[in-house]
């Protein structure tokens, strides 16, 4: 199975600006995601503004699928996540991005097709869009300013997807034009310093030398 088919579909629902579609494509491609679907973009499709903003990620726009409605966009998928910034009073699981993408990875590994819905910039997804979703994704943002730009939300989900794939290093050490010393080399260096310090009279009084 091609790598692109082992990924979730990121579905942009009624995006209002071509620039945000292009920025979302860049965010997806930053983390190796290729499957974009676009539902009823306000400014039409294809979008020259999206292409201009996508820069090196234009390939995603070339292969992006266009749909008239959400139900058509997710019709071939078996599990749908919907992103939301506020509670909807619906009886659905509400997951943090990390857990949602972990579950998405598990389902895709089992052969399921998974979609993630992203709403319009101004007000987000409508309840009608969310009704058919299996679970909601809620980002723990500042409650006094919960609004995320479309591309920001896409970037966050794409990053968590990559983490779920085990492709994010939590820490590393880079050695600039050098390599790790062997234990014997470290020991010899310590002996060298000790000899030089002793020659300089650093270990005084001599009785305290072993503890210094």
Regions found by a protein language model. Give the residues of each.
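Post-transcriptional modification and biogenesis factors for structured RNAs
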Residues: 1-212
């Amino acid at each position: 199975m091609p790598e692109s088919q082992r990924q979730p579909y990121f579905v942009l629902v009624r995006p209002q600006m071509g620039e945000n579609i292009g920025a979302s494509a860049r965010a997806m491609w930053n983390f190796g995601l290729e499957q974009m679907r676009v539902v009823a973009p306000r400014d039409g499709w294809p979008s020259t503004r999206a292409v201009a903003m996508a820069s090196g990620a234009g390939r995603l726009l070339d292969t992006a699928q266009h749909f008239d409605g959400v139900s058509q966009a997710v019709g071939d998928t078996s599990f749908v996540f919907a992103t939301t910034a506020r509670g909807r009073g619906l009886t659905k699981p509400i997951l943090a991005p990390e857990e949602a993408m972990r579950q998405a990875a598990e389902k895709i590994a089992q052969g399921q097709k998974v979609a993630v819905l992203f709403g319009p910039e101004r007000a987000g997804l409508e309840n009608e869009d969310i009704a058919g979703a299996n679970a909601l994704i809620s980002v723990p943002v500042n409650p006094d300013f919960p609004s995320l730009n479309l591309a920001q939300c896409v970037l966050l989900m794409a990053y968590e997807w990559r983490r779920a794939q085990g492709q994010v290093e939590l820490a590393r050490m880079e050695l600039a034009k050098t390599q790790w010393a062997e234990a014997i080399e470290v020991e010899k260096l310590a002996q060298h310093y000790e000899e030089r310090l002793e020659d300089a009279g650093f270990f005084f009084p001599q009785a305290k030398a072993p503890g210094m």
